[in-house]
């Protein structure tokens, strides 16, 4: 656990006090975004000259002056959901790179950090927090095989809230990319991380601050339960989706998206809408971090979890795989992660008159430990 006094800060310092939103809950609802884009050129998901335009995880842009090459780029940021700045930096890196992993790209030409310091920080708080955030971001980049990838930090801005994120850029050939548009009836839907990370983080903060919601958790759960759930979430949220992206190529995945602020069903629907064929994504399993469903029920927030709409930060990839490849993918994924991460077959793809994603009535909830 982060101990602020060891860094010269007040013992009661909490980074999460410098924001009113946490993690990817800072996103406006998907339908609101669609309303703003409606009737504009930005709305078009397949603009001329773009393989991927608005609405998906990252931009894939053919380079007109360099035929055979494409620019892959994403910009993403969020607000603190943990009090440990170094841990926040690690989660931020995983979250930023995930958008590019969703199209099967695993090499980066540059990664740029986006950082803003809160206007409410003292000079000492700013020096400690920003330094540790940068350390976590950079160390995670190096530890995951990107020691030679340039990390750029152009400027540090002042903002009412502390913001952390980045820009990931890759220039590659078309064979390195898995476009998110080729789902086929009969495909199996695989999810590479459990849901519930954001709620696990929230519960940890309730515990720290002894809130009314924390007292509700104690009616059926212990402090040890909250700690265990938080640790599972940290393990999941700091893990990069790199191995999943590599296995997408090995098993000829048809498309993928990463699960963040719009929730599983929101991102699944967005992916379904992007397909060349009219398809229905039918989700019949929801893998959720241990205790999270119980936590959400105790504090009256279970509806979003039971409907597949819980906000996620640094979530897994939702991948459409040929039916005969799904079991092999899951076995290889567990082996590639040394058994420390799990993937889940959560549904299937069928032909449809209109593309959509739905949660089956008899959905199965799977409690996940890592």
UniProtKB/Swiss-Prot annotation:
Key words, A-Z: ATP-binding, Kinase, Magnesium, Metal-binding, Nucleotide-binding, Selenium, Selenocysteine, Transferase
The Swiss-Prot or TrEMBL record lists the needed cofactor(s) as:
Mg(2+)
The entry's active site is 24
PANTHER family, sorted: INACTIVE SELENIDE, WATER DIKINASE-LIKE PROTEIN-RELATED, SELENIDE, WATER DIKINASE
- Name the chain's protein: Selenide, water dikinase 2
Gene Ontology BP term (one) = selenocysteine biosynthetic process
Q: What is its EC number?
A: 2.7.9.3
GO CC terms on record?
A: cytoplasm
Q: Name one GO molecular function term.
A: ATP binding
Superkingdom per UniProt:
Eukaryota
- Quote the subunit structure annotation: Homodimer.
What does the record say about tissue specificity?
First expressed in the midgut anlagen with subsequent expression in a variety of tissues including the gut and nervous system.
Q: Where is this site: Important for catalytic activity?
A: 27
The cofactor remark states: Binds 1 Mg(2+) ion per subunit.
Q: Where does ATP bind?
A: 27, 55-57, 76, 99
User: Catalysed reaction per UniProt?
Assistant: hydrogenselenide + ATP + H2O = selenophosphate + AMP + phosphate + 2 H(+)
Name its species.
Drosophila melanogaster (Fruit fly)
Gene3D superfamilies, from UniProt? Answer: PurM-like C-terminal domain (3.90.650.10), PurM-like, N-terminal domain (3.30.1330.10)
* Family, as annotated: Belongs to the selenophosphate synthase 1 family. Class I subfamily.
Its job = Synthesizes selenophosphate from selenide and ATP.
User: Could you confirm whether the keyword Acyltransferase appears in this record?
Assistant: no
Binding positions for Mg(2+)? Answer: 57, 99, 258
């Amino acid at each position: 656990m982060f101990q602020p006094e060891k860094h010269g800060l007040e013992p009661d310092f909490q980074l999460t006090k410098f924001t009113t939103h946490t993690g990817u809950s800072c996103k406006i609802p998907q339908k609101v975004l669609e309303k703003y884009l409606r009737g504009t050129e930005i709305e078009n998901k397949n603009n001329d000259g773009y393989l991927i335009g608005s609405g998906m995880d990252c931009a894939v842009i053919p380079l007109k002056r360099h035929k055979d090459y494409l620019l892959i780029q994403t910009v993403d940021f969020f607000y603190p959901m943990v009090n440990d700045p170094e841990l926040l930096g690690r989660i931020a890196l995983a979250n930023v790179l995930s958008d590019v992993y969703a199209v099967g790209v695993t090499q980066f030409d540059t990664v740029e950090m986006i950082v803003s310091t809160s206007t409410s920080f003292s000079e000492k708080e700013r020096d400690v927090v920003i330094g540790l955030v940068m350390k976590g971001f950079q160390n995670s980049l190096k530890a995951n095989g990107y020691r030679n990838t340039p990390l750029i930090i152009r400027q540090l801005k002042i903002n009412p809230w502390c913001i952390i994120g980045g820009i990931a850029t890759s220039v590659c050939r078309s064979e390195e990319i898995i476009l998110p548009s080729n789902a086929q009836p009969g495909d199996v839907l695989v999810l590479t991380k459990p849901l519930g990370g954001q709620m696990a983080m929230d519960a940890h903060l309730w515990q720290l601050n002894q809130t009314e919601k924390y007292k509700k958790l104690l009616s059926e759960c212990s402090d040890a339960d909250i700690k265990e759930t938080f640790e599972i979430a940290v393990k999941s949220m700091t893990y990069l989706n790199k191995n999943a992206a590599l296995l997408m190529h090995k098993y000829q995945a048809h498309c993928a998206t990463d699960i963040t602020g719009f929730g599983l069903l929101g991102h699944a629907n967005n992916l379904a809408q992007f397909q060349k064929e009219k398809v229905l994504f039918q989700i019949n399993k929801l893998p959720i971090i241990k205790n999270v469903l119980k936590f959400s029920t105790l504090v009256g927030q279970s509806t979003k979890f039971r409907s597949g709409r819980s906000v996620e930060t640094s979530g897994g990839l939702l991948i459409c795989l040929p039916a005969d490849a799904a079991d092999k993918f899951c076995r290889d994924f567990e082996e590639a992660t040394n058994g420390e991460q799990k993937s889940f077959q959560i549904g299937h793809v069928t032909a449809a008159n209109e593309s959509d994603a739905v949660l089956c009535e008899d959905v199965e909830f799977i409690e996940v430990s890592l």
